[in-house]
Amino acid sequence: MEASGKLRAYLELVRAHNLLGTVLGVIAGAALLGEVNVAAAIASASAAAVAAGGYAINDYFDVEIDKVNKPERPIPSGRVGAEEARKLALALLALGPLLGLAVGPLTGAYAALNAVLMYYYSKSLKKTGLPGNLAVSFSTASTLLYGSLATAEWAGEVARVLRTIPIILMVFLMTLAREVVKGVEDYVGDKEGGVKTLAVVKGPDFALRAALALACASLALAYLAAPLLSLGYAFLAFVTLGGLLSLASVAACLRSEDPVRCAAKPRRAMKVAMFLGLIGILVDRLVQPVFYPHVLHAGGEEG
């Protein structure tokens, strides 16, 4: 294989396009505390390394299922060897915590926790269904916590991290909804592989209804959390757009004659919703001083 083709295969293996969301999550977490600095940059690189390693080790352990669900993936298609993927994954999972230590011991330990979680999710938790969904949801939502933790630890004010918990829960719920929908999308291969997703255990329709409820709860929590973190109209506009897009997409899939085939649409819609939520945090922090300066930053002091 040509060098360029090999590079593309590696980038596909680590889901390079998804790493943008990881970096945005860390930066948004820092922005929640009102400051994006060098700690956020280091934490972004650390989180991206852990996420990339998690994606790679997932493909390594998931190769038999991917032969059914996604035969075009790098390992089942033969573009990346299984042992290559394993070594790359372990290197990235080790690199993340080492980078985190450059910020501080808590940030390094938190990166290590996520690295271990991603490894064992791929190795065994994934087949447990809901526990695996919860692990992925925690890992995704933790990017915001990672950003706020790194910023707070760098400033020597770790307790400030508690202010970000409501928004982290919002992301957690939307990610959990997406994972439930992903179980519907992968229903055929998961059933053959013995993966106990909600869709396999309770049926695709039940899983979609559960995802709809989780997405509703996530949107409601955004409205409750916004005033607690001094997030204003820009944030709410982005979150509302993403939330309504997700709800409409899941509802349309429920009305479909074949929910398994259409499940990719709400799964993508929820990914867009989470991206819009992160962008909403950043945009809100940028426009706040101009359009509604009376609203205090969550990490600032009253003046």
UniProtKB/Swiss-Prot annotation:
Its cofactor is Mg(2+). This is Digeranylgeranylglyceryl phosphate synthase. The lineage of its organism: Archaea, Thermoproteota, Thermoprotei, Desulfurococcales, Desulfurococcaceae. Belongs to the UbiA prenyltransferase family. DGGGP synthase subfamily. Pfam families: UbiA. GO terms for molecular function: geranylgeranylglycerol-phosphate geranylgeranyltransferase activity; magnesium ion binding. It is a multi-pass membrane protein. Prenyltransferase that catalyzes the transfer of the geranylgeranyl moiety of geranylgeranyl diphosphate (GGPP) to the C2 hydroxyl of (S)-3-O-geranylgeranylglyceryl phosphate (GGGP). This reaction is the second ether-bond-formation step in the biosynthesis of archaeal membrane lipids. It is found in: Cell membrane. One of its GO terms (cellular component) is plasma membrane. The chain crosses the membrane at residues 23-43, 88-108, 130-150, 164-184, 206-228, 232-254, 272-292. It comes from Ignicoccus hospitalis (strain KIN4/I / DSM 18386 / JCM 14125). Its EC number is 2.5.1.42. Its main location: membrane. Keywords: Cell membrane, Lipid biosynthesis, Lipid metabolism, Magnesium, Membrane, Phospholipid biosynthesis, Phospholipid metabolism, Transferase, Transmembrane, Transmembrane helix. One of its GO terms (biological process) is glycerophospholipid biosynthetic process. It catalyses: sn-3-O-(geranylgeranyl)glycerol 1-phosphate + (2E,6E,10E)-geranylgeranyl diphosphate = 2,3-bis-O-(geranylgeranyl)-sn-glycerol 1-phosphate + diphosphate. Pathway: Membrane lipid metabolism; glycerophospholipid metabolism.
